[in-house]
Design a protein with these regions (language model features):
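Extended catalytic cores of very large enzyme megasubunits
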Residues: 2-302
Length: 302
């Protein structure tokens, strides 16, 4: 068995080494024919989705080659299950982007023997349990960087971080709050670039968090948090307080029955600030979180 596996690996390596390569002009010309003269589509496909190695050698002439690669690899997996689709059937589904259009990362990653690539476009990350220690924050930062190196877009929620002024067990005595860590994650995103294209990061926080106003204002200062998009998670209770003109209670931890930090705010004023900032700087985005949970499958998507 080991000898058979070794022989298969040797055959695969020989195939990789001897595989035909194409110049950019050759791939662009073939892709231009494929896309019936659409130069933008041809250029984007060659630059972003054609199979390449770490040195930039191009191994696919047009999307036809890519669709054969996808069909071949998925057919290999299909054989493990009842009623598998054949490579030919799968190719017919992919051909000319007719019925199935994979995301960008799957198009470049599936069947890619030349680079370690992600098979998903986006990842929501974080740590289970109490994850607001400095060590936990650094581990999340490292996970973010590793995912971005593999083309993954990343999102994480900062609602677990202690609000500014909270006591901490180190020489700093009190927490710095959300904003410095927003800047840290943002800087990591700008540092991880591929062909001049930086990573994609979304940061969020619950409106219930006592530092949510600082989060909402973070990008109003020019040059701050430039490597991330930010969105605030709004619950029904907050919107009801806006409509009724009543106070809204913020707390930390946000879902605790015995919070250590509690304050009341004017919900209508904070809502006006969200609208003003979004008008002026296009951020923050808004996630109506209770609605998302109601309308989605919570244990799969939220």
């Amino acid at each position: 068995v080991h000898k058979q596996c070794l022989n298969l690996h040797i055959i695969k390596l020989k195939t990789i080494v001897n595989r035909k390569t194409y110049t950019f002009d050759e791939a662009f010309k073939a892709s231009l024919d494929y896309f019936t003269g659409d130069e933008l589509a041809a250029k984007v496909w060659v630059n972003k989705y054609a199979l390449k190695d770490a040195f930039g050698n191009i191994y696919e002439e047009s999307p036809v080659d890519m669709h054969h690669r996808l069909a071949s690899e998925i057919a290999r997996v299909e054989k493990k299950y009842p009623n598998p689709l054949s490579e030919e059937e799968l190719f017919a589904l992919f051909d000319h982007f007719r019925y199935i259009v994979p995301q960008g990362s799957p198009m470049t990653g599936i069947g890619n023997d030349y680079q370690i690539a992600s098979l998903s476009n986006c990842f929501v990350i974080g740590l289970d349990g109490d994850a607001d220690s400095y060590g936990a924050i650094i581990r999340i930062d490292e996970e973010q960087v590793q995912l971005m190196k593999r083309r993954g877009g990343v999102g994480h929620d900062l609602s677990h971080i202690r609000p500014k002024g909270s006591p901490v067990k180190n020489s700093a005595l009190t927490s710095t709050g959300l904003v410095p860590f927003m800047e840290r994650y943002s800087n990591s995103t700008r540092e991880v670039a591929q062909d001049g294209r930086r990573g994609a990061l979304m940061l969020s926080v619950s409106i219930k968090h006592p530092d949510s106003e600082s989060f909402i204002d973070a990008k109003m200062t020019e040059g701050k948090v430039t490597g991330a998009n930010v969105s605030v998670k709004i619950d029904d209770e907050f919107m009801q307080a806006v409509i009724n003109g009543t106070p809204y209670k913020q707390q930390y931890p946000i879902d605790s029955s015995e919070p250590t930090n509690v304050k009341e705010i004017n919900a209508a004023e904070l809502w006006k600030k969200i609208i003003h900032n979004a008008w002026k700087s296009a951020e923050p985005g808004v996630l109506f979180w209770d609605t998302i949970l109601r309308e989605s499958v919570p244990d799969s998507y939220a």
